[in-house]
Amino acid sequence: MSSGCRSVGGSTWGNWRGDGGDLRQRRVLSPVCSAPAAGSWIGSQLGNVGNLLATPHPLGKPASSRVGTIVLACLLLFGSCVVRAVPTTPSPPTSTPTSMSTHSHGTVDPTLLPTETPDPLRLAVRESGILAEDGDFYTCPPPTGSTVVRIEPPRTCPKFDLGRNFTEGIAVIFKENIAPYKFRANVYYKDIVVTRVWKGYSHTSLSDRYNDRVPVSVEEIFGLIDSKGKCSSKAEYLRDNIMHHAYHDDEDEVELDLCRPSLQLRGARAWQTTNDTTSYVGWMPWRHYTSTSVNCIVEEVEARSVYPYDSFALSTGDIVYASPFYGLRAAARIEHNSYAQERFRQVEGYRPRDLDSKLQAEEPVTKNFITTPHVTVSWNWTEKKVEACTLTKWKEVDELVRDEFRGSYRFTIRSISSTFISNTTQFKLESAPLTECVSKEAKEAIDSIYKKQYESTHVFSGDVEYYLARGGFLIAFRPMLSNELARLYLNELVRSNRTYDLKNLLNPNANNNNNTTRRRRSLLSVPEPQPTQDGVHREQILHRLHKRAVEATAGTDSSNVTAKQLELIKTTSSIEFAMLQFAYDHIQSHVNEMLSRIATAWCTLQNKERTLWNEMVKINPSAIVSATLDERVAARVLGDVIAITHCAKIEGNVYLQNSMRSMDSNTCYSRPPVTFTITKNANNRGSIEGQLGEENEIFTERKLIEPCALNQKRYFKFGKEYVYYENYTFVRKVPPTEIEVISTYVELNLTLLEDREFLPLEVYTRAELEDTGLLDYSEIQRRNQLHALRFYDIDSVVNVDNTAVIMQGIASFFKGLGKVGEAVGTLVLGAAGAVVSTVSGIASFLNNPFGGLAIGLLVIAGLVAAFFAYRYVMQIRSNPMKALYPITTKALKNKAKTSYGQNEEDDGSDFDEAKLEEAREMIKYMSMVSALEKQEKKAIKKNSGVGLIASNVSKLALRRRGPKYTRLQQNDTMENEKMV
């Protein structure tokens, strides 16, 4: 904005000084006029007047004439300008973008304007200032030295490659043992084939065939198979609670040699007594013929058992429901066994026979025998902890690096490009079942690798450590140190006067060989004291304490064994997660190493730039310290330190004046002058005149001046915008978007790769993969055998026949008496067996609920029969003729009467009485004969002579009694009469 009105007459007089100080005429007259636009006529005239007044007259006229010229110019000026008193509001804005009036907004309260003096010109100048719309302004008091700072000395840049703890060593990785425990077993059984053949006149056909497998008794295995290499042709087996016998070719029992069959299976051996099946056909046609074949078979097969080893399967398809580690020893009795105890037998020091070479084994073994309903199985018993192991060796790693990172161990194996993660705590092998083999195999493998590769270059720095990695992998790790590093440790020990053997220090296992390890003392390590005469009381106390310690230790061990919960280690079927972990760790280490190098270079660069900062602070301490502290401060160098004061934020209003010219005609302000208040709502007396500094800093003094120059152009930051001055006169506000930004920053956007841990994930579990098939052969076989055992021959279902046991005992007794005794025993046992069978059958029939119902029906039927018998007897007594000869009915009687010419109405008065009497005599005679026969039978049954004599006497009496029987005539007299 122009600071004065240009004179019409174009006078060129000098300065005018008033009481208010050296104020240029154009600055005094400018606020009197209305705010003209830049380049307007009034503004140009005011500028000309100011220039005339500022230029001295060449003729050197006196000052009085200059005063008159000034008065005349003012009169002309007031004639062309609209003179205003102290305005209450700034001039309204115009449409011109460069007008100074666009920077005055709203109505200004007169109480907020500065009122140091009642000079209306000064009030007008302040009122015409530019109010800052937004932005923060600060005022900084001069530093006095109460607060001093210094520049930080150069830093030591870190070396990131030494920030992690690495340990090298040898490792053996174990996985879950999913393979079954395999062992050799012998199967003994007799194959029975019973055929039934029908022989016709010209053909023969097979009508029935029965096939069964029966076990060979353990006694026969001892006495024949493993003793002579033979087998009996007799088969004795129990089916349906009945002992059956079968003989080969239906002949007497003989001993047959065991021979190799013509067909041999791979991985198995077998021996049998015959290759043929007997089928007997007789010479007589139209009959059934039955024949029996008994083939004794011994097979050497492979047996398998999986954890928890409660059963095992044979390659023949049979499943034995007992643990292969079951035995009669203390530790083996706790194993599973589903069979009755009499079916199991264990023999110590057994020497089996090789059926091919007919030679017995040299080394005795402990042999187990189990007799199932169909086969007898034998195998060599071994201890479970020695043979079975739930973990198996997977990889031997000759170079492994262990890295401790964020509370976990990372085992990196470059040979297989895998990284395994585990906890920092060691895994206890006792917490998993059957892991005794791990320590032995790990030690052997690690020692073998060490002797081959590292014995001359490295030493062990610890014992074997076990860690359970994610995915179910057990890592047996033994750390090592190079000889050079070990020498450094040795030198450090010597320097610190610690004379220890390096081998014993780095390898604790060496102490075990020398027996120099100091053991922890306990009451168990103290030998049992022997009482003496001098210290009887002390020895008794030691004896009691030692006994308590032994009991406490035994109790603790037993409680630990029973309370310990063993958990099987499950291993994933793939290590892709470990390979991904290795790849990610490799990328992470490479990228982080690269970024660490950049950070190291950055730190080195900062140390070098620190020297530049130290020199620049001597030139502009406030700017350097403010940039360093990221805070507005005023600074001043005090020797080798810097005095600072913190800048205060201005809460009041800040007004920017529109001219940068000072009272001196040759001197101008290098920064725009401002008027401001420290706090809000301050009165006119609280206004302060100052000068705008860099970055919205307000100086409380106006000391920044420079000689006035032509064609001067300046941009100053005022709030959040910029103001443009031309020839020390405000022109307009400039938004920051109109000024192109040149960035001095070099972007360094570094982000370290975060740690990621890959977990093993299984899309399909092992159980799902096993269940994908249509049929499960193992389950089908198990169900079939369990079905047969459950409903037919399992021990818990079949009741023991005590009578059969007694009979077998009696038969054995008679058999021991020789051939005669055996014959007598057969006769006696036959009769006794018949009686026992009858009684047992009746008892079984009565115990059956259907038998009870049948007996009830029989009782009812007996009562009905008794009723009819009683009725029949009574009928005989009342009318014996009708009862004995029911054919003499009324119809026959009527027919007889009709034949004699009588009517039905006629009575029976003409009936022949003589014939009736004869009939009665005949009936009486028949009754007597019947009674006589009964008496004779009783006498014969009792074998009594009196009865026989009485019977004979009765016969004689009957013979002589009564007339003799005369034959009746062929023709009836009545019929003859009718015929006549």
UniProtKB/Swiss-Prot annotation:
Q: Which residues lie on this side of the membrane: Intravirion?
A: 871-980
On subunit structure and binding partners, the annotation says:
Homotrimer; disulfide-linked. Binds to heparan sulfate proteoglycans. Interacts with gH/gL heterodimer.
Coiled coil stretches, renumbered: none
Protein name per Swiss-Prot or TrEMBL:
Envelope glycoprotein B
Q: Which UniProt keywords apply?
A: Disulfide bond, Glycoprotein, Host cell membrane, Host endosome, Host Golgi apparatus, Host membrane, Host-virus interaction, Membrane, Signal, Transmembrane, Transmembrane helix, Viral attachment to host cell, Viral envelope protein, Virion, Virus entry into host cell
Instruction: Give each disulfide bond as a residue pair.
Output: 140-647, 157-603, 231-296, 389-437, 668-708
Name the source's superkingdom: Viruses
- Hydrophobic membrane proximal region as annotated region, ranges: 794-847, 823-843
Q: Name one GO cellular component term.
A: membrane
| GN (gene name) | gB
Q: Where is the motif named Internalization motif mapped on this chain?
A: 965-968
Which family is this sequence assigned to?
A: Belongs to the herpesviridae glycoprotein B family.
Q: Which organism is it from?
A: Equine herpesvirus 1 (strain HVS25A)
Biological role: Envelope glycoprotein that forms spikes at the surface of virion envelope. Essential for the initial attachment to heparan sulfate moieties of the host cell surface proteoglycans. Involved in fusion of viral and cellular membranes leading to virus entry into the host cell. Following initial binding to its host receptors, membrane fusion is mediated by the fusion machinery composed at least of gB and the heterodimer gH/gL. May be involved in the fusion between the virion envelope and the outer nuclear membrane during virion egress.
- Quote the PTM field: A proteolytic cleavage by host furin generates two subunits that remain linked by disulfide bonds.
Residue spans of biased composition, Low complexity class: 96-118, 505-516
Gene3D superfamilies referenced in this protein's UniProt entry, alphabetically: 1.20.5.1890, 2.30.29.100, 2.30.30.1230, 6.10.250.3280
